[in-house]
Amino acid sequence: MKFQLNGRRSMAVLLASVRVVAAVGLIVPLLFAASVTAWLLACALAILLAGSLVRWGFLLLIDESHFIASTPGLRVAVVTSFVPGAESLPMLERTLAGMQKLCYPHDTWLLDEGDDDAAIELCARLGVRHFSRKAKAEYQTEQGQYQRGTKHGNYNAWLSEIGFANYDVLAAIDPDHVPGSNFLTETLGQLSDPRIAYVQSPQEYYNQPASLIARGCSEESRDFYWISQRAFHRFGSPSVIGAHGVHRMKALQAMGGLAPHIADDLLLTLRYQMSGWRGAYVARVLARGLAPVDWRTYVKQQRRWATSLFDVKFFLYPEMVQGMPFRGRVVGLLQGLTFLQDGVAALCCAMALAALLVAGVPASLASALASPPVLTSATILLLTGLYPHLFHGPHRNLTFHWRAGLLRLVKWPYTLLALADVIRRRDRGYALTAKVGRATADRSFLWPHVIICGLIGATWILAMTLGSIQHLLPHVAAVAAMLPSLFLVGSSFIPAPAAFDPMLADGHADAEL
């Protein structure tokens, strides 16, 4: 395995060098085209290629954790939360059953936000311990550590009441994530290093077959979980992921519990790094959960994530950076980079399209786009971009991730809206991703794409009326720009599958590889 990884790294060095040359060959002719449209296109490409170059740098830094036998005698609590009405009992039952089967002595806890009778009965039947803060006024605050209706408030109530005093290790698992029986045996050994505060593993989905959106979510997350996180492991700074992870209670207590923020996992990562703690990353699939299966859930989730990441990056990270080691600064700087680069690049492309439709195609731009250096460089970049897929753990292949590309084209307006929310300091509040029933018929979330199509269409018609379009390129660009929006609007009328499908869950009853 080590030999194969080193061999792939050597090839990555060669291909990265080729990509740098190809990037120059693609961008420089556009710069010399001497037109605003060409410069905007060059800017968008430079932003996207810079992000790609960072990912290729991560390929060279990938480090693998080694299996370490678990230390016997640890007091371990395996915990999940539950919000009645937003999360289904059949889904919860599979998660609790999986938690009970973990191969290390532990207590399983359910943190029930609603003190639900059916959840209490389920816990009694499975032998799971039940906790609810519903009747505890001291754990029901409007803001802060115990904010009502939030995951961090729910966990912090249990930690203060029970967890910190009675356990050495917290294994936190979201209610839709079914752990494999090896979840604890694969992770607890990493805590034998007293510097390690937390252990992470990749986030995978068992409902990928449910829809195009679910498969796209899996594709677009692979670079992060199988490349970036493994590179950060080398420096002891992988990101905490809220879906499932293991924490040393002593370290978590020193942080004050889960961070009171929508991006509690990112903020907790930065707090750990600022305090000198390290993390470990086990690059093996140890649990599988649910991905969004419909457009509304997906774009709302992405906007919420982008808003929380931007808030941490712009307002909290600058205050924390002075006390951080270099590795912590890098984590804080690079987290959310994809959201930002996609939004800014899309904005540059939108302005370039407007210039094409209004002012026409400069001869220098048409010549540059059809030149051999640009065409050759674009082909090289497209084909070599497949190589990082060989680092994607169980998903190693050389296929195009077109679904992930489609999702990126769909979500960029919501990324810019998230950026606007943060700049205006608009608090959109905490929102839970519902994992019960089917998507509603509400399509109000489509308005950004309806406006995009309307603006492009109106400008296109006006340009043709005025006779400013004398080249095929503006027509092709206008159609290409509207296609993702039209696809989103049209496909939103196709009935979406249920958020939770018992058959898919049972098909991945054990997440071990």
Predicted regions: what is each one?
Residues R94-H106:
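Short, acidic, metal-binding catalytic loop of nucleotide-sugar glycosyltransferases
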Residues L170:
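Short aromatic/hydrophobic "clamp" motif used to bind/position activated sugar donors
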Residues F131-Y167, S181-A263, R271-M274, W295-L337:
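Long helical/loop segments within the catalytic core of UDP-sugar-dependent glycosyltransferases
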Residues G25-I47, W56-I62, I68-T71, T338-G429, ...:
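Membrane-embedded multi-pass helical conduit in multi-pass membrane proteins
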Residues P260, T269-R288:
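Catalytic donor-sugar/metal-binding loop of nucleotide-sugar-dependent glycosyltransferases
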Residues D112-I120, A124, A135-E138:
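A conserved acidic beta->alpha catalytic loop
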Residues I173-V178:
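The conserved acidic donor/metal-binding loop of glycosyltransferases
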Residues M1-A97:
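N-proximal low-complexity "stem/linker" segments adjacent to membrane-targeting elements
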